From Swiss-Prot:
Disulfide bonds: 24-42, 35-63, 48-52, 67-78, 79-84
Main location as per UniProt: secreted
Stretch forming the signal peptide: 1-21
Tissue expression notes: Expressed by the venom gland.
Keywords tagged on the record: Acetylcholine receptor inhibiting toxin, Disulfide bond, Ion channel impairing toxin, Neurotoxin, Postsynaptic neurotoxin, Secreted, Signal, Toxin
SUPFAM superfamilies the record matches: Snake toxin-like
Family: Belongs to the three-finger toxin family. Long-chain subfamily. Type II alpha-neurotoxin sub-subfamily.
A Pfam family it matches: Toxin_cobra-type
Name this polypeptide is given: Alpha-elapitoxin-Oh3a
Length: 93
């Protein structure tokens, strides 16, 4: 009886996947990290600075509880699956 109860507890924990958190790419190292509890959104934030024409857009990657507010001149993409915010590739002419 104890074995059956223990088996049910283990199966419940495995099925519920308690404590699961999202993994996102995070700058500056652009490596995959587990997001803090409650931050289940990955985001990619891009914008132009003075070097945009020669170096490309600036990029900020990270985790958030909600999708960040869009500011003028800033593009934000949000997603909610593991590592869904890779560093964007630059389109070459």
């Amino acid at each position: 009886m104890k074995t059956l109860l223990l088996t049910l507890v283990v199966v419940t924990i495995v099925c519920l996947d308690l404590g699961y958190t999202t993994k996102c790419y995070v700058t500056p190292d652009v490596k995959s990290e587990t997001c803090p509890a409650g931050q289940d959104i990955c985001y990619t934030e891009t914008w132009c600075d003075a070097w945009c024409t020669s170096r490309g857009k600036r990029v900020n990657l990270g985790c958030a509880a909600t999708c960040p507010i869009v500011k003028p001149g800033v593009e934000i993409k949000c997603c909610s699956t593991d590592n869904c915010n890779p560093f964007p590739t630059r389109k070459r002419p």
